[in-house]
Amino acid sequence: MSIREQLEVMLADAPGELARFTSALKEEHVNIEAMSIQDANEYLLALYDVRGQTGRRVAPRDYYEAILKESARYSMIRMITDNSQKAVEVLTNAGYQVKVQEVMGLVMDNRPGILNKVSKQLGDAGINIHYTYGSGFSDSDNALFIFRVSDLKKALELFPDGHP
């Protein structure tokens, strides 16, 4: 596992919406291998607070308030599926707008320090990690992590077999 296609979908922040979203995939036998859901409003509130604390807020308060009001209605889903092409088709037909991005997927040892090792290798190579998400089970030897990085090609050269 190295280059993976990640799907990004803005999902309405409403009861039952995730069930509707996953039902469309289930009906067409598309399996979700990894997923991250981020509340858009919480992210923007945190950014607003940090910008205020550092004195680096670049827009007036009413600008942020307008964006916060709009973002309160959505969450962002990032996910990896077993068939990204089919998932895009299914979700598009269900009325969702889907963005596809290439990301790096690594199967890592599920032990303390491995994420530190990987992030250090990427940093030492001058590669920025925009975000990552992943998971492993305590009784499993492996964990799957997804990385969105500034230089995918260079990152893949560090981990050509998809393992650190």
Q: Which residues does each PLM region occupy?
A:
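Structural preference for solvent-exposed beta-strand-turn elements
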Residues: 1-164
